[in-house]
Amino acid sequence: MRTLLPVAALACLTAGPCAAAELPVFDAHIHYSHDAWPNLPPADAIAILRKAGIRRALVSSSGDDGTQRLFDAAPELILPSLRPYRTRDDTGVWVRDPAIIAYLEDRLARYRYVAIGEFHVYGADADLPVMRRTVELARQHKLLLHAHSDVDAIERLFRQDPAARILWAHSGFERPDEVRAMLRKHRNLWCDLAFRTEHGSGGKVAPEWRAAFAEFPDRFMVGTDTFTPERWHYIVEHANWSRAWLADLPPALAERIAWRNGEALFAGADRGR
């Protein structure tokens, strides 16, 4: 029986706010998909995450075997999320393919997860039967939904399950004022900042994003998004870039966005296989 282990104690917890260079990182957006496997064995992938100072990573893969391989290699580091994609070819069609439900149900019966996603769904497609069943599975298994979606789709998901917990991938690629409006409306909505740079260009936090972070200090987290194999070689650089702009925030707020929010969101994830 394998176990999702609680995160190791961090030295800076008792030493006060961490210096920017020492900030651990919770990466909320990692993929280890089939096209990465041939040239990046699990041990090498884990070594990259550790070199970057990542203490935990939310990982989903196309297909899920990639996530399971990383979890087997480092269960104390990897938080498994079930992506509804068997290969990348499912990205644009999964929500109309009933076979995806059987895939999800099979994986959920065999393994433990903390989330379903990252998945792509937009607008009215969020009300299609496959998406509705996915929301039901998340509710049944008490899993977070990691949604790469527009505002319309997020609203539809919450109408289906007002108690759903949703991590909004890329903060929807929305403007910070729109992100703030959504966070005010939905208390169970969190945002990752993956594949965005405008919030911390040049090591300085943009004023409109600073206001968003200050209003919702417990709702944002960083992420790399290794959506292609090449992105794995950017993980260390991205972690250091994140530390640079986080250093422009008050230390307590920087710690929250860097890792505390992720740890809090998945605090109950120490469940057995």
State what each model feature region is.
Residues R2-T3, L23-F26, A43-S60, D65, ...:
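Mid-to-C-terminal alpha-helical segments outside catalytic/metal-binding sites
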Residues D65-L144, W190, F195-E198:
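Active-site gating/metal-coordination segments in enzymes
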Residues L82, V95, D125-V222:
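Catalytic pocket-lining loop regions of alpha/beta-barrel enzymes
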Residues V25, I116, W168, V222-G223:
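Generic enzyme active-site microenvironment
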Residues I30-P42, D89-R96, G200:
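Acidic/histidine-rich helix-loop elements
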Residues L4-G16:
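Bacterial N-terminal signal peptides
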Residues I30, F119, S171, T224-T226:
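Active-site metal-binding loops of divalent metal-dependent hydrolases
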